[in-house]
From Swiss-Prot:
ATP binds at residues 85-92. Keywords: Acetylation, ATP-binding, Coiled coil, Cytoplasm, Cytoskeleton, Isopeptide bond, Lysosome, Membrane, Methylation, Microtubule, Motor protein, Nucleotide-binding, Phosphoprotein, Ubl conjugation. Transmembrane segments: none annotated. Expressed in the brain (at protein level). Expressed in the brain, liver, kidney, spleen, heart, lung and sciatic nerve. The modification Phosphoserine is found at residues 933, 945. It comes from the Eukaryota. This is Kinesin-1 heavy chain. It comes from Rattus norvegicus (Rat).
Length: 963
């Protein structure tokens, strides 16, 4: 870089006119202007480099703010222009304006036009490369406006510690129209919103970067300059803008970043040792523009309305602080090898002089330390030391020049050697052009392969997302199944509690029966009338014995069922109970348990059969796939061998063809010579006296022979070139075939992986089916349980009726008993009420079981529906996999056709050389999308073929606007 120089940041102030809402509100125009550099607000003056009134045109603003910076950027300096102010103060109007209106366009479109106009007027030996970037800072994230997929770019530093946005799209341009098309494309992607103060409020800070690199083709001097054109979002008061929701979040981030910018300006103005550039991504990007190597111009946009007076004062104070900041600017020069060498020699001489000075001073110091007195003429004199160093260098240079001159004289080239060197150079240039074309083709091929790889990655990601959704659905169904199991367990537990309570109540009934027997004995002793009651009691005992016998029979049937289950399961440990005093409720529980065991055993047997059939089918599929894979591998090896043999055969045929052509040529020449000799002999016989005419005929024949020879030589050379081209094409096809084989191998691996995933999902589907079968079996068990409980309740109800009738008859018979009998009737009533309470509790439990059963029946259709949806999803995934394979096959065919078409197009294009006028160099740049304006095609330097407009551009000055 050149020597640095300091310069202040230029601050321009612009006031917009009152808008319609301010006029309707009756706001006052508070700004008063004094000259062209001062404005008065509330009787306080604010001075800037330039103050623009409301009537100032866009052209005047541009001429005073930005016109000079074009020359600076093209001379190798960095430049920045950004607009600052509150919302709706005219920042976007100042920077952009109406992009395609000659009078209403702002700074950005005008500066673009001026850059190219200035280039066209410069020396034709200069070559320019111009590239542009367009990005925004939205919610403190850097978002590329030319590629909306890049939403969170990062800020890095280059080798000179200059911040830059990594990964941002760079478009190479060669005309103002292409730049404007790029701006239109980026502006359409920028975030805007409607607020109470502005219908088109910018919700982000936009930065348009123009990077200009120039090279002098004669001196090889290289300069580079960057121009940042920044449109900041305005600071907002929520009470005025009415922002809410997402707009409110945007306003918070805007105010935060502007506050960070204000802190940086304040720190630079106060000369602080620490400047908080890293508090915001915007200040990080503009670090070089604020106190660094850059010529910076700030346009502060203000509202003249009294409604916004406080915001206007804050903006003016910001501008005054920024005006005190000094930047250190220097030219961005890339030194050539010769310049680096000169600089090295200069530093070397300087270092040598300093060493001589140090040596002289050390000698003089040692003499003084040793006690000597150094005379004045021997003391150090700077001029004398420089003169001695210059004389010594001159002698060395004279000594070195003599052998160099002798070598130069001996090394002069002859004309033949010079021509030979020029021919070699031409051949090398041609090889470079061929390599450029090959590089272009390979770059396009790599780009297409990248696109295909991204498509495959997206397809893989979607498949993985579907798999995750399926897994989540399976987990949810598993959780619901577990919950249903818990509910069934709770129901069974409730039934067990009921059985225990029933046992307790039965024990209490037995105790009360004993008490009743005692009372009956007392009644028998007191009254003979109770003998009939004893007889009836005997009948009741007989009935009880009958019930016990029936219970014993039921127990025997249950034991038979247990024995059958033990034989089916393989467990023969079922033992006969010793006692026979079990009641009906215990038998009911045992019967339910036995029926459940039977159903589970049947389910297990059925599932085992299904698993065996599934395993058999899976083994068959695996064998078929292995056979198909072996056949494919065999077919691939056969094709490779066939291609190799065909290649060798083609080479042999070409060699034979060349030999035959050479023999045909030689025979043709001999035939022509024989015909010529025959013709000469005939003419000699007919015209013996015309010797002169015969000589002329002989010359004509020789000329004809020579022309035939030249024609055959040209044909031979063209055929050889064609053979070489065919061999190259065969080599390319072999490479392509190898790539297709690798691609096929990759697809085979992918197919195996997807097949494994499919098997896993089939297994999970089978598990769900088994779970559904279990749920159905549980429903059947609950149904049987419900029927059993209903039967038991009916039995209890019948017993209750019998017991009530018995008590009624006994009460009638004992109506004439004395007052001592009242205690017995009260005990009977208490027993009746106790049994009635038990009956009510059993009825409630029955109703609860019925409700639970109904809920389970309602839940069952939902689970069946989910199971069907899961099966349909699996089918959809299988069809998607099949479609993806078909698409991959079509893509491979289309890719092969495109490669063939590109080869044919490259082969058919002619080479063209650069002219003397201005030309646009567009070497191929991988990774760029086509630019928006295809109206300016350019020629490839060193290749001569035309390419698209999405490639780096080199622009030469002095020769016109386009090639």
């Amino acid at each position: 870089m050149a020597d640095p120089a300091e310069c202040n940041i230029k601050v321009m102030c612009r006031f917009r006119p009152l808008n319609e809402s301010e006029v309707n509100r009756g706001d006052k125009y508070v700004a008063k202007f004094q000259g062209e550099d001062t404005v008065m607000i509330a009787s306080k003056p604010y001075a800037f480099d330039r103050v623009f009134q409301s009537s100032t045109s866009q052209e005047q603003v541009y001429n005073d703010c930005a016109k000079k910076i074009v020359k600076d950027v093209l001379e190798g300096y960095n430049g920045t222009i950004f607009a600052y102010g509150q919302t709706s103060s005219g920042k976007t109007h100042t920077m952009e304006g109406k992009l395609h209106d000659p009078e209403g366009m702002g700074i950005i479109p005008r500066i673009v036009q001026d850059i190219f106009n200035y280039i066209y007027s410069m020396d034709e030996n200069l070559e320019f490369h111009i590239k542009v970037s367009y990005f925004e800072i939205y919610l403190d994230k850097i978002r590329d406006l030319l590629d909306v997929s890049k939403t969170n770019l990062s800020v890095h530093e280059d080798k000179n510690r200059v911040p830059y946005v990594k990964g941002c799209t760079e478009r190479f341009v060669c005309s103002p129209d292409e730049v404007m098309d790029t701006i239109d494309e980026g502006k359409s992607n920028r975030h805007v919103a409607v607020t109470n103060m502005n219908e088109h409020s910018s919700r982000s800070h936009s930065i348009f970067l123009i990077n200009v690199k120039q090279e002098n083709t004669q001196t090889e001097q290289k300069l580079s300059g960057k121009l940042y054109l920044v449109d900041l979002a305005g600071s907002e008061k929520v009470s005025k803008t009415g922002a809410e929701g997402a707009v409110l979040d945007e306003a918070k981030n805007i105010n935060k970043s502007l506050s960070a910018l204000g802190n940086v300006i304040s720190a630079l103005a106060e000369g602080s040792t620490y400047v908080p550039y890293r508090d915001s991504k915007m200040t990080r990007i503009l670090q070089d523009s604020l106190g660094g190597n850059c010529r910076t111009t700030i346009v502060i946009c203000c509202s003249p309305s009294s409604y916004n007076e406080s915001e206007t004062k804050s903006t003016l104070l910001f501008g005054q602080r920024a005006k005190t900041i000094k930047n250190t600017v220097c030219v961005n020069v890339e030194l050539t090898a010769e310049q680096w060498k000169k600089k090295y020699e200069k530093e070397k001489e300087k270092n040598k002089t300093l060493r001589n000075t140090i040596q002289w001073l050390e000698n003089e110091l040692n003499r003084w330390r040793n006690g000597e007195t150094v005379p004045i003429d021997e003391q150090f004199d700077k001029e004398k030391a420089n003169l001695e160093a210059f004389t010594a260098d001159k002698d060395v240079a004279i000594t070195n020049d003599k052998p160099a001159a002798a070598i130069g004289m001996a090394g002069s080239f002859t004309d033949a050697e010079r021509r030979k060197c020029e021919e070699e150079i031409a051949k090398l240039y041609k090889q470079l052009d061929d390599k450029d074309e090959e590089i272009n083709q390979q770059s396009q091929l790599v780009e297409k392969l990248k696109t295909q790889m991204l498509d495959q990655e997206e397809l893989l990601a979607s498949t993985r997302r579907d798999q995750d959704n399926m897994q989540a659905e399976l987990n949810r169904l598993q959780a619901e199944n577990d919950a249903s199991k818990e509910e069934v367990k709770e129901v069974l537990q409730a039934l067990e509690e009921l059985a225990v309570n029933y046992d307790q109540k039965s024990q209490e009934v037995e105790d009360k029966t004993k008490e009743y027997e005692l009372l009956s004995d007392e009644l028998n002793q007191k009254s003979a009338t109770l003998a009939s009651i004893d007889a009836e009691l005997q009948k009741l005992k007989e009935m009880t014995n009958h019930q016990k016998k029936r219970a014993a029979e039921m127990m025997a049937s249950l034991l038979k069922d247990l024995a059958e289950i033990g034989i089916a399961v393989g467990n023969n440990d079922v033992k006969q109970p010793e006692g026979t005093g079990m009641i009906d409720e215990e038998f009911t529980v045992a019967r339910l348990y036995i029926s459940k065991m039977k159903s589970e055993v049947k389910t297990m047997v059925k599932r085992c059969k299904q698993l065996e059939s599934t395993q058999t089918e899976s083994n068959k599929k695996m064998e078929e796939n292995e056979k198909e894979l072996a056949a494919c591998q065999l077919r691939i090896s056969q094709h490779e061998a066939k291609i190799k043999s065909l290649t060798e055969y083609l080479q042999n045929v070409e060699q034979k063809k060349r030999q035959l052509e050479e023999s045909v040529d030689s025979l043709g020449e001999e035939l022509v010579q024989l015909r010529a000799q025959e013709k000469v002999h005939e003419m000699e016989k007919e015209h013996l006296n015309k010797v002169q005419t015969a000589n002329e005929v002989k010359q004509a024949v020789e000329q004809q022979i020579q022309s035939h020879r030249e024609t055959h030589q040209k044909q031979i050379s063209s055929l050889r070139d064609e053979v070489e081209a065919k061999e190259k094409l065969i080599t390319d096809l072999q490479d392509q075939n190898q790539k297709m084989v690798l691609e096929q191998e990759r697809l085979r691996v992918e197919h195996e992986r997807l097949k494994a995933v499919d098997q896993e999902k089939s297994r999970k589907l089978h598990e769900l089916t088994v779970m559904q079968d279990r749920r159905e079996q549980a429903r059947q068990d609950l149904k049987g349980l419900e029927e059993t409980v209903a039967k038991e309740l009916q039995t209890l109800h019948n017993l209750r009726k019998l017991f009530v009738q018995d008590l009624a008859t006994r009460v009638k018979k004992s109506a004439e008993v004395d007052s001592d009998d009242t205690g017995g009737s009260a005990a009977q009533k208490q027993k009746i009420s106790f049994l009635e309470n038990n009956l009510e509790q059993l009825t409630k439990v029955h109703k609860q079981l019925v409700r639970d059963n109904a809920d389970l029946r309602c839940e069952l259709p939902k689970l069946e529906k989910r199971l069907r949806a899961t099966a349909e999803r699996v089918k959809a995934l299988e069809s998607a996999l099949k479609e993806a394979k078909e698409n991959a096959s079509r893509d491979r065919k289309r890719y092969q056709q495109e490669v063939d078409r590109i080869k044919e197009a490259v082969r058919s294009k002619n080479m063209a050389r650069r002219g003397h006028s201005a030309q646009i160099a567009k070497p191929i740049r991988p990774g760029q999308h086509p630019a928006a304006s295809p109206t300016h095609p350019g020629a490839v330097r060193g290749g001569g073929s035309f390419v698209q407009n999405n490639q780096p551009v080199g622009l030469r000055g002095g020769g016109g606007k386009q090639a």
